[in-house]
Amino acid sequence: MEFNQEVKKATDPIYQKISKVMPEIEWLIHAPYIYKINKLKKEKNAVILAHNYQTPEIYHGIADFSADSLALAVEASKTSADIILMAGVHFMAETAKLMSPNKKVLLPDMDAGCSLSSSITGKDVRLLKEKYPGVPVVSYVNTSADVKAETDVCCTSANAVKIVKSLNVKKVIFLPDDYLAKYVASQTDVEIISWKGICIVHDQFNENEINNIRKNNPGIKIIAHPECPPEVIKASDFAGSTSGMINYVKDNQPKKVMMVTECSMSDNIQVENPNVEFIRPCNICPHMKKITLPKILDCLENETGEIIMDQETISKARLSVEKMVAIGR
């Protein structure tokens, strides 16, 4: 695709915003796609929802709304667009379909999965419910629609503790993230029956890495995602969802910060917090990185990658997500 004066004029304001985190030579490749996608989504009355782990050219260049999983679910339920294109992974697109079943929901790469989502099935949940009758099931939103259909209430990392406390019970089944389950257990008096799922991004971090970063960067603030191992969270200054991490940086404006999460977060947030120095030992999510501008353009042009679900699954799974949204953060 050609970078011409028309493209330059339309996309220059975006590049001025992200130039500190993107070389010009890279921008010249992205800009024509951004121009065409932004034009096409208006023609088709499409909205692009992007997760916080998307790369800057997507997050700042074409997304109409960028957020964590909880806010994306809420936004999907409110949009007046005819088409929802999810710049995220498969379970996020499914959740958007649950919240707007009459909309056309598209995912640019149907293989953009999630290690947490693939760690458990609806059948697994049914077996757990048989083993622990009467114990409510709380499922992380990072799960398939089949799992959500067997769930009492969903949660995200932003509201997991609040959701569990709201049930007013002594015991819950919490699926599928084992580390998030341990984090919730540390913040409540509820007995947690967990699953052995992990996020391949956050599982790679370790306590020694955190301590070395702190040693070499006096005064640094280290903020971690609750999907990290417990010892990493303990060694950090703050633990929170992606939105919680963004708000921490925005509100506290630390001189130096390390975000113990996916790599693109630091790039995206630095754009809006130029006075903060981001120390970047981070890990890449291979699933999120399957979403690219060329794939988004192709998906939007041809309306491929549509999320299709049967009505029974939608009806059952939607209830658990609606309960989560109603409880909020």
Regions found by a protein language model. Give the residues of each.
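Active-site loop-to-helix "anion-binding N-cap" substructures in soluble metabolic enzymes
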Residues: 2-259, 265-329
